[in-house]
């Protein structure tokens, strides 16, 4: 008993309340009942035990949303609080411990009434008592702050209960409550009968389904290659207008050869006939060339099946290999006539088609049999190199830009150029072998030897070194093969590679300055931050990040202790110098060691560093010594001890260097023509198979389908040429690659690529899964018509589920876009705003070869986008983590210095172009003269003086 004669008792501050008595938004108009005093609770039935347990859990879950605080559940007149809440720990207040918080409850003389009731006087009096309790205020401030934060975060869901739930106050008011068929209270919003009927029908239809439909991402089993099968590649050379010449070639073959069946059966006789036809080309060019074209196409009139036809094609073209130079000379002569002459163009263009057909078939056979018959392949490669066929075709296509003619057959020339590049340089498998050999030649580790090992780029490692130096100035991190630090502040090359450490990030610079002075020997740690916001207004944002721009002056965890149990348990294998007084935290030292061991220096990076040093030497007016250039493959001789793979790799590099030197001035026109050819696909029309069921309608659409097919094949060849050149140029020298990438970018490739991707984005999935009509004509079908047995055995399977003919074109386009915009912020800014939507459409079909360029561009584009864009493209962002190899310290989503990247973007582009001009003029001065660059020895040749002469000044 206390002084007032009232007894005290301990009881829980919050008691469970029945769910039907709860009211929204904690504004109560009626009296509530506690759950333990409801009749159903006092006398529980067996069937309702589980329901009551669920209600108790639900009460606890709804406490925060419905403001079930202590103020809402104080007792009535006989239960008034006059005590103070004891000091509780943080865990107890958070509900992490099982202690029950209790207060003293004053009991009134009216103890006989067992029902708790809320009255307005009791609530007001209780609130007045709370104003005098300081401990209660502290708890309530914290609760209010938490509730305010939740309301700010969930503002859009503030009135969910008012929309979805029944007004619980109506129960206590005794008003009419809707009851469903089962006799239960219906808390749903009232609806009219028609709407309820439609809802019932939808529910019934859902119940009838055995399982809900689930949209799976369909996968396409396809791999990007520069050369697929011989059947596919040979058929892509022809169009419907070319088939009319087949009969003439067969007739001339029978006229030239007295025993055609023996030619088909006896290989020795066939070789002698081929030799006679080659020798007679100067006397009768047209007839001999058409007969050789029929031989190259496999003598299809004498074959009985497609497999036999393919076998004869391989045999006959290998017989033409020893005479390849004569065929190339005849082809060049005819091509020049089609380009320059004005007479007999119809005849000349037919001869150009047949001569180029022979070369195309020989190239395809050699690409396919590179591993099986290397001797014949090397003969063809050497013959093409001696005759400069690759350079001739490039300049031939360049001439078409200024003097376009139908007789030049530009579509066939583009396809032939693509096959020549693949043959002379190599396909994907040859590229991997060559890259491995070149890396070994320069003493570098090929990246694919350890694909599971994460690495870090030199630029990110340099940024990490600067961060460690800013925190621990006396600690010297290992350089790990990085170039020496030189003053580049006055050089234009400073914009090429800019490390961006966290200490110089604007977010870090905005952090507060450390509270203690940096000169303090051993300052105490800062006080713990206040978790409670006591002021009015919204809770301010607080950041507890460390300012990386200030040195760390606190003692290390392993400083001054000889016996460290952690180091004893971990085998570090670190040699410590006894006289070294610099001690840093163990985690920092371990991170420095891991990153230094994982540093990956690519061949392209070393090449860029070398040319950058030469560029800086020239800027300062120093003399250069270019006697032994490490990356000049033209002057590199074969070593007697070199392996076969290394010799082959050096030969490929020399062919690339020769091609680059000869065609440097032609790349601009080549890219222009190729992009113009690619843009022709923007006018294509597509027809679904379900719309073209009539055979007569299909025959009417066949000419249009042939045109669409020819445009798409030209798109594939044009994109393949650019992709192959970029790929091989980068392996030869990074600045060769950058020069071609600049030319492609300046030709507005980004707009062209985005337009083509947008054109095909809607039909892409259905096109891949063969839902659209394709032309029924093909090279093999046309050849089968010349032999009855062949025609009977030949069958076209048009019911295939997947048609991947168009996928290489998209893969090439995306890869070129990635190579042109990669690590170039200025070019990323030119990407259209809808590029993310296009990527999502091509992301619908699962295929890693299509995913990789999309995800790599997404990885570079994401930091520059806002939160809404990131949320809308979260599927692409997740794909980067799933399918792409990331670096050790790669915080690519939000860790970039956006303002710094954007401000330095233009400078990076200018510095790169200046370095490209220096590289080309330094190594390919003769080729640069065709572009207007050269030494000016006399002042009279100065550009300003020449302009003055033109103006008569």
Swiss-Prot record:
Segments for region (Disordered): 104-160
Biased composition (Acidic residues): 141-160
Domain of life (superkingdom): Eukaryota
GO biological process, one term: cellular response to pheromone
Compositional bias (Basic and acidic residues): 114-134
GO CC annotation: cytosol; endoplasmic reticulum; endoplasmic reticulum membrane; FAR/SIN/STRIPAK complex; Golgi trans cisterna
InterPro entries in the cross-refs: Far11/STRP, Far11/STRP_C, Far11/STRP_N
Additional note from the record: Present with 1080 molecules/cell in log phase SD medium.
Subunit structure: Component of a complex at least composed of FAR3, FAR7, FAR8, FAR10, FAR11 and VPS64.
Role played: Participates in the control of the reentry into the cell cycle following pheromone treatment.
Protein name: Factor arrest protein 11
Organism listed in the record: Saccharomyces cerevisiae (strain ATCC 204508 / S288c) (Baker's yeast)
């Amino acid at each position: 008993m206390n002084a007032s004669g009232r007894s005290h008792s301990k009881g829980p501050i919050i008691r469970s309340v029945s769910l039907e008595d709860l009211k929204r938004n904690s504004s109560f108009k009626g009296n509530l009942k506690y759950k333990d005093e409801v009749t159903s609770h006092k006398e529980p039935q067996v069937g309702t035990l589980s329901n009551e347990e669920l209600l108790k859990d639900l009460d606890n879950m709804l406490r925060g949303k419905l403001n079930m605080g202590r103020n809402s559940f104080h007792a009535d007149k006989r239960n008034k609080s006059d005590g103070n809440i004891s000091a509780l720990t943080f865990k107890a207040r958070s509900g992490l411990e099982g202690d029950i918080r209790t207060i003293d409850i004053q009991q009134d003389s009216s103890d006989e009434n067992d029902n708790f009731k809320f009255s307005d006087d009791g609530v007001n009096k209780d609130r007045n008592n709370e104003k005098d309790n300081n401990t209660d205020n502290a708890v309530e401030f914290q609760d209010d702050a938490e509730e305010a934060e939740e309301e700010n975060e969930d503002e859009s869901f503030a009135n969910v209960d008012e929309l979805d739930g029944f007004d619980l106050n109506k129960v206590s008011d005794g008003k009419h409550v809707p009851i469903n068929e089962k006799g239960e209270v219906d808390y749903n919003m009232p609806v009219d009968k028609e709407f309820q009927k439609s809802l019932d029908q939808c529910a019934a239809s859902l119940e009838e389904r055995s399982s809900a439909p689930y949209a799976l991402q369909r996968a396409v089993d396809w791999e990007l290659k520069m050369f697929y099968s011989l059947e596919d590649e040979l058929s892509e050379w022809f169009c419907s207008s070319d088939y009319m010449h087949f009969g003439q070639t067969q007739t001339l073959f029978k006229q030239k050869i007295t025993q055609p069946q023996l030619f088909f059966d006896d290989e020795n006789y066939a070789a002698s006939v081929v030799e006679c036809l080659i020798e007679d080309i100067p006397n009768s060019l047209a007839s001999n060339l058409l007969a050789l074209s029929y031989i190259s196409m496999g003598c299809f009139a004498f074959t009985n099946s497609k497999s036999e036809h393919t076998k004869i094609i391989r045999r006959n073209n290998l017989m033409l290999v020893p005479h390849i130079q004569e065929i190339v000379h005849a082809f060049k002569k005819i091509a020049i006539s089609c380009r320059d002459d004005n007479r007999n163009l119809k005849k000349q263009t037919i001869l150009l088609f047949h001569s180029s057909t022979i070369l195309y078939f020989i190239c395809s056979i050699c690409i396919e049999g590179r591993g099986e018959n290397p001797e014949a392949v090397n003969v063809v490669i050497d013959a093409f190199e001696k005759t400069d066929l690759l350079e001739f075709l490039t300049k031939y296509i360049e001439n078409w830009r200024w003097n376009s003619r139908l007789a030049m057959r530009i579509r066939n020339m583009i396809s032939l150029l693509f096959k020549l590049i693949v043959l002379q340089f190599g396909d994907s498998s040859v590229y991997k072998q060559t890259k491995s050999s070149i890396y070994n030649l320069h003493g570098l580790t090929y990246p694919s030897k350890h694909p599971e090992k994460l690495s870090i780029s030199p630029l990110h490692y340099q940024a990490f070194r600067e961060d460690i130096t800013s925190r621990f100035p006396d600690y010297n991190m290992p350089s790990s093969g990085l170039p020496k630090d030189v003053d580049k502040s006055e050089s234009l090359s400073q914009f090429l590679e800019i490390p961006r450490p966290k200490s110089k990030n604007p977010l870090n610079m905005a952090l507060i300055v450390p509270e203690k002075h940096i000169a303090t020997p051993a300052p105490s740690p800062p006080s713990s931050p206040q978790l409670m916001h006591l002021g009015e207004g919204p809770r301010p944002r607080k950041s507890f990040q460390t300012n990386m721009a200030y040195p760390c002056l606190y003692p290390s965890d392993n400083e001054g202790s000889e016996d460290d149990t952690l180091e004893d348990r971990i085998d570090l294998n670190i040699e410590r110098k006894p006289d070294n007084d610099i001690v840093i935290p163990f985690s920092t030292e371990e991170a420095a060691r891991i990153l230094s061991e994982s540093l990956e220096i690519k061949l392209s990076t070393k090449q860029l560093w070398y040319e950058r040093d030469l560029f800086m030497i020239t800027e300062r007016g120093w003399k250069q010594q270019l006697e032994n250039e490490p990356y000049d493959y033209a002057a590199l001789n074969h070593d007697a001890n070199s392996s076969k793979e290394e010799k082959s790799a050096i030969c490929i590099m020399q062919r690339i260097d020769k091609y680059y030197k000869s065609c440097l001035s032609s790349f601009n026109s080549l890219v222009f023509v190729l992009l113009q050819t690619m843009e022709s696909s923007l006018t294509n029309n597509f027809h679904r198979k379900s719309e073209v069921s009539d055979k007569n309608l299909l025959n009417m659409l066949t000419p249009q389908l042939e045109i669409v097919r020819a445009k798409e094949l030209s798109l594939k060849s044009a994109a393949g040429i650019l992709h192959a050149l970029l790929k091989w140029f980068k392996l030869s020298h990074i600045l060769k690659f950058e020069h071609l990438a600049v030319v492609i970018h300046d030709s507005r490739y980004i707009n062209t690529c985005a337009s083509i991707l947008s054109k095909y984005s809607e039909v892409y999935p259905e096109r891949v899964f063969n839902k659209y009509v394709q032309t029924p004509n093909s090279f093999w079908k046309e050849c089968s018509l010349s032999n009855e047995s062949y025609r009977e055995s030949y069958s076209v399977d048009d019911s295939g589920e997947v048609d991947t003919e168009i996928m290489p074109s998209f893969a090439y386009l995306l890869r070129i876009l990635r190579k042109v915009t990669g690590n170039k912020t200025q070019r990323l800014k030119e990407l259209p705003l809808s590029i993310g939507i296009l990527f999502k459409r091509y992301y619908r079909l699962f295929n890693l070869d299509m995913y990789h360029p999309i995800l790599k561009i997404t990885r570079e584009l994401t930091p520059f986008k806002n939160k809404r864009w990131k949320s809308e493209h979260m599927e692409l962002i997740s794909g980067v983590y799933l399918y792409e190899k990331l670096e050790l310290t790669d915080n690519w989503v939000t860790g970039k210095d956006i303002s710094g990247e954007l401000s330095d973007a233009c400078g990076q582009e200018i510095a790169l172009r200046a370095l490209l001009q220096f590289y080309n003029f330094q190594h390919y001065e003769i080729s640069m003269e065709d572009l207007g660059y050269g030494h000016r020895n006399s002042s009279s040749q100065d550009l300003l003086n020449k302009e003055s002469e033109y103006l008569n000044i």
